[in-house]
Amino acid sequence: MARITLRQLLDHAAERSYGVPAFNINNMEQGLAIMEAARACDAPVILQVSRGARSYANDIMLAKMMEALEVMYPDIPLCIHQDHGNNVATCLTAIQHGFTSVMMDGSLKEDAKTPADYAYNAMITTEVSRLAHMVGASVEGELGCLGSLETGHGEAEDGHGFEGALDRSQLLTDPDEAARFVAETGVDALAVAIGTSHGAYKFTRKPTGEVLAMDVIEKIHERLPDTHIVMHGSSSVPQEWQDVFNAHGGEMRETYGVPVEEIVRGIRFGVRKVNIDTDLRLAAAAAFRRVADTSRTEFDPRKFLKPAMDAMSAVCKARFEAFGTAGNASRIKVVPMAEMARRYASGSLKPQAKRAEAA
């Protein structure tokens, strides 16, 4: 098997009505944990890398690690995705280092803190789409800002997130504007704002439609039935791992994530990519704390890392099964990026929108 573009993978997911978890990765242990789970489930994989992860691990290290994972797990279609690119250069250097997909997040300006207007977002996302598609790479765009409908605030992730408070209209993607944005930019996938946020502290109570606007996804899918929708900030923050974390010296306050059943509902309405980072961080940190608390003389890093890897793998397996990803790796025949570039050039991959009905 080879590296796969996001577009081909999500096209396959749409044809077979499943979703694909996109796990953030910073190091070898995360990579191995995710890929072991994928092998066990026969699931295709999206490994995504933030700008913070690229700074932490270095592009050369990450590129070589991805090469190693590709060789070690030859039967798993592997999409390597830039998460929350803040400018054209971030996206193009990712492609230069072997990424098959990039996200141009033009919902914020280049400082990754200031909300951008529609014109800026459409302009810069269109430019990234034009350049990436020339070499066959996929592009994800974002419309609307990721943040809490309870508070109006967003949670910065690796330095990416708006400052201050926004009103509800800025925190929810408008379906008509989404149709216009996809048509203008030519993106392969669209991240939408529905009240989710980065980090562990997403909701102060089990979310309802008041703070988790799944109906927005349904309306966008109605306008854009062939567009792949992306849910960001979609960790479920499992209670069992919160309990382990706190039982062994942690001080995590009560919080609620995005329920898995709501994500599964979203998959029925066009959600194809589901971003997950906090769940793996929490599982790994909880496993670390348990070893540190119960084996206080232990100092071999491997004795901490192996349980952390097992914990992360368990979360990944659960998501592959719940989202219907399991069983699909062996059904995919990877299309090379050069062929994807030819298809983009021919216009055969141009997005289509359903016209809005007159009032």
UniProtKB/Swiss-Prot annotation:
Binding sites annotated in the UniProt record for dihydroxyacetone phosphate: G199, G233, S234, S235, N275, I276, D277, T278
Binding positions for Zn(2+) 1 per the UniProt entry: H84, H198, H232
Catalytic reaction annotation: beta-D-fructose 1,6-bisphosphate = D-glyceraldehyde 3-phosphate + dihydroxyacetone phosphate
GO biological process, one term: reductive pentose-phosphate cycle
GO MF annotations in UniProt: fructose-bisphosphate aldolase activity; zinc ion binding
Enzyme nomenclature, EC number: 4.1.2.13
Names of required cofactors: Zn(2+)
InterPro entries membership: Aldolase_TIM, Class_II_FBP_aldolase, FBA_II, Fruct_bisP_Calv
Keywords: Calvin cycle, Glycolysis, Lyase, Metal-binding, Plasmid, Zinc
Keyword Metal-binding (UniProt): yes
Keyword Zinc belongs to the record: yes
Pfam families, per database record: F_bP_aldolase
Active site location: D83
Protein residues bound to Zn(2+) 2: D105, E142
Cofactor note: Binds 2 Zn(2+) ions per subunit. One is catalytic and the other provides a structural contribution.
Biochemical pathway: Carbohydrate biosynthesis; Calvin cycle; Carbohydrate degradation; glycolysis; D-glyceraldehyde 3-phosphate and glycerone phosphate from D-glucose: step 4/4
Residues that hold D-glyceraldehyde 3-phosphate according to the record: S50
Enzyme class (EC, first level): lyase
Subunit comment: Homodimer.
UniProt function note: Catalyzes the aldol condensation of dihydroxyacetone phosphate (DHAP or glycerone-phosphate) with glyceraldehyde 3-phosphate (G3P) to form fructose 1,6-bisphosphate (FBP) in gluconeogenesis and the reverse reaction in glycolysis.
Family designation: Belongs to the class II fructose-bisphosphate aldolase family.
Protein name per the record: Fructose-bisphosphate aldolase
Species name: Sinorhizobium medicae (strain WSM419)
Lineage: Bacteria, Pseudomonadati, Pseudomonadota, Alphaproteobacteria, Hyphomicrobiales
Gene name, Swiss-Prot/TrEMBL: cbbA
